[in-house]
């Protein structure tokens, strides 16, 4: 199997491990085992555990960007923003991705991870501004609601109190229900 395919297998295995255990708690031995490779081979693909985690930071933000870009299509303004918001509620159904996002933010005490996360977040922000053309404060509100959605979904608050689904459009079929 080519190294690029093995690298993808490692990233897939690493997503689940890092989402569950975070940067400090994840064992590269466990990632290698889940990927079906040896730990020394893992380190040929990714020289350090941090390098592997940084690849996941990039991958996670790229997935959100790709989702938003596809949702917005040729739309602009509020229509694009609404389409991206709706697509994000569906993206949050992937609990592993959601928990990985939370672990990425938690790992920002490491300067290298913080810099990579900040750069990816900035790129996402600028993309949304470019696509929507909406004012700065509207984009601030979009990100604030998105972060609230992350935290509420991570704690599974919608299953405890239906008021936590109030950010969902009334006709949305894909928002959490009790």
Residue ranges and their predicted role:
Residues 29, 40:
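Residues within helix-turn-helix
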Residues 111-123, 128-178:
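Hydrophobic/aromatic-rich alpha-helical bundle segments in the mid-to-C-terminal region
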Residues 5-6, 37:
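The short coil/loop that forms the "turn" connecting the two helices of the helix-turn-helix
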Residues 79-102, 107-115:
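Helical hydrophobic small-molecule/effector-binding pocket
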Residues 9-16, 20, 34, 44, ...:
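Alpha-helical structural segments
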Residues 17, 91, 127:
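Short alpha-helical functional segments enriched in proximate histidine and acidic residues
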């Amino acid at each position: 199997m080519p190294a690029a395919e093995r690298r993808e297998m490692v990233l897939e295995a690493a997503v689940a491990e890092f989402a569950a255990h975070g940067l400090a708690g994840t064992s590269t031995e466990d990632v290698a085992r889940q990927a079906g490779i040896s730990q020394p081979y893992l380190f040929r693909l990714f020289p350090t555990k941090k390098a592997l985690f940084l690849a996941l930071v990039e991958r996670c933000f790229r997935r959100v960007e790709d989702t938003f870009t596809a949702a917005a299509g040729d739309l602009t303004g509020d229509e694009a923003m609404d389409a991206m918001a709706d697509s994000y509620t569906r993206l949050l159904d992937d609990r592993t991705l959601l928990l990985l996002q939370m672990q990425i933010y938690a790992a920002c005490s490491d300067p290298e991870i913080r810099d990579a996360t900040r750069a990816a977040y900035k790129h996402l922000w600028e993309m949304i501004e470019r696509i929507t053309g909406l004012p700065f404060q509207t984009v601030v509100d979009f990100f604030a609601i998105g972060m609230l959605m992350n935290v509420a979904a991570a704690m599974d608050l919608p299953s405890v109190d239906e008021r936590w689904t109030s950010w969902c459009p009334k006709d949305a079929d894909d928002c959490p229900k009790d």
